[in-house]
Amino acid sequence: MGANSFGRFFTLTTFGESRSAGVGAVIDGCPAGIPLCADDIQKELNRRKPGSSGPFSTKRNEDDICEILSGVFEGRTLGSPIAVLVRNKETSSKDYENLKDVYRPGHADYSYDLKYGHRDYRGGGRSSGRETIGRLIGGAVAKKMLEAFAIKDGKKTIEVQVRAEEIAGIKTSLPLKEDEALPEPIFEKLSALASNGDSAGCILSCSVLNVSEGLGSPVFGKLDAVLSQALMSIGAVKGIEIGGGFYSASITGSENNDISKNFSGGILGGISCNMDYPLNLNHENGRKDENTCQIDFRIAVKPVPSIKMNQASFNKKGEKCMLSVGGNHDICLFPRIVPVVEAMCYLVLADAFLVSKIERF
C-alpha cells in the first residue's frame, strides 16, 4: 500500500493496524543533535490515550507506551531514521467476527475491499484511528526540532492552539480547550447520544503562533495547500477553511484586503507572512519589523461512525442487512483529536522549515 509517508525532507512513515501487534512511525530527515527522549513522545501519546479524555472517549484497554528503537542516542538524535513502536494490547478479533463480511456505513470497509480486494476487518485495520499514534510520534519529533532551532536562533517557539467552537451542533460561548469541562448543554447532548448508541462531530478553531515568515513553496508546495492535505489526511476531518475561508466569498475585495485583519490566515501566495502592519510597525524607523506570523484555520470533524444504533448496510454478496457496531468507541473525537491536529501542523512546519533552508542563500 502506497501513500503511507508524508513530507519532502522531514518525512514521516506510519505503520500498523488497529489490531496488529503494534503501530508506530519512522521519521527521517531530522537533523542530528536535537534533544529527544521517550518522555517527549509519551506525553503526546497520553493526550490521545483511550479512556483518558473523559466519559465520552473509548474505553479500549491500551497502555500506549512508546519504544524508541533507533535514531536516538544519549538523549539526542543521530540524524539517522528514528523508529518508534507502540505495542497494541487489544488484538482480539472477537468484536469484529460478525462484521468481516459486512460493510459498516461511514467506514472504509467497502472502499478498502473495492480497492485492494483484501483487508483487515478487525477494527478498521489500517483506516483505524490507531494510525494517528504514528502521527503523534512524528509530530513530537517535529516539535522538538522546531524548538531547538528557535532556541538556537533566539526566536519564540511555535505554539499550536486548538479549541472546540462547536460540539454536537452546539456552539460554545468561548473556544473550549481540551482539558476544560464540557458546558452542561453539550454534556447532556453527548450523554443522550451515548444512551441512544449514537455519536457526534465537532468544529475546531486552530491558530499556529510564532510561525517564521517565508515558509511554503509555490506553486504546488504552497503552505496552505500542504497544510490542507495534512489535515484532510486525518480520517475524521471532512472540511477545512484557512483565514476568512468561505466568509471571504461574501465580502468585498477592500474588506478582504484589510491588513488590520487576518483574512489570509497568515498565508499569501502559499507563503507564510504577516501583513498586519499597524500592529508590527517599528515606529523608530517607520518599517515593519521582521516578525513571525499567525496561521488561522478551522476544521470540521465528522461524527464517529462506529455506533451501537442499528443501521442499514450491505454485505459482500450485495445483500441488504442491519447491523450494530459493538466494541469500545468514542462518542465524540474531541478532545482526543486535538493532539493529532497539532502533530500534523508541526510536521508541515518542520518540513517547510527545512525546505526553506535550501530555497534561498
From Swiss-Prot:
| Keyword Lyase in annotation | yes
Q: What is this protein identified as?
A: Chorismate synthase
- Biological process according to GO: amino acid biosynthetic process; aromatic amino acid family biosynthetic process; chorismate biosynthetic process
GO MF assignments: chorismate synthase activity; FMN binding
Record's subunit section:
Homotetramer.
Q: In which pathway does it act?
A: Metabolic intermediate biosynthesis; chorismate biosynthesis; chorismate from D-erythrose 4-phosphate and phosphoenolpyruvate: step 7/7
Q: Which residues make up the binding site for NADP(+)?
A: 48
Pfam families in the record: Chorismate_synt
Look up and give the organism this protein is from.
Treponema denticola (strain ATCC 35405 / DSM 14222 / CIP 103919 / JCM 8153 / KCTC 15104)
Q: What's the superkingdom here?
A: Bacteria
According to its record, what are the GO cellular component terms? cytosol
Role: This reaction introduces a second double bond into the aromatic ring system.
Q: Which cofactor does it need?
A: FMNH2
Family note: Belongs to the chorismate synthase family.
Give the record's cofactor note, including how many are bound. Answer: Reduced FMN (FMNH(2)).
The record's annotation in CDD domains points to: Chorismate_synthase
Entry's InterPro entries? Chorismate_synth (IPR000453), Chorismate_synth_AroC_sf (IPR035904)
Please provide the record's keywords in A-Z order: Amino-acid biosynthesis, Aromatic amino acid biosynthesis, FAD, Flavoprotein, FMN, Lyase, NADP
Catalyzed chemical reaction(s): 5-O-(1-carboxyvinyl)-3-phosphoshikimate = chorismate + phosphate
* Listed EC numbers: 4.2.3.5
Which gene carries the instructions for this protein?
A: aroC
Where FMN is bound, by residue? 126-128, 269, 302-306, 328
